């Protein structure tokens, strides 16, 4: 997997903003039509603990929280 295979960072941020700041791998798959592996890698590379964090929902789904877009 090469970086050019991954969606652009700005594209992922736009999707996160539109979806209220909380997205899952499945959200990214549906929105841009990539594989689960590419979607997961795209989100994982953005996790920095400040702007983007990870949370596990009550049903065990990993949710990526784009903190600048939540609670607006």
Where are the model-predicted features located?
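Long, charge-rich, low-complexity intrinsically disordered regions
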Residues: 1-72
């Amino acid at each position: 997997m090469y970086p050019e295979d991954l969606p652009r960072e700005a594209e992922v941020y736009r999707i996160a903003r539109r979806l209220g700041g909380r997205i899952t791998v499945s959200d990214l798959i549906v929105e841009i039509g990539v594989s689960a592996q590419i979607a997961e890698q795209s989100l994982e590379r953005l996790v920095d603990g400040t702007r983007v964090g990870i949370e596990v929902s009550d049903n065990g789904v990993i949710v990526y929280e784009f903190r600048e877009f939540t609670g607006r």
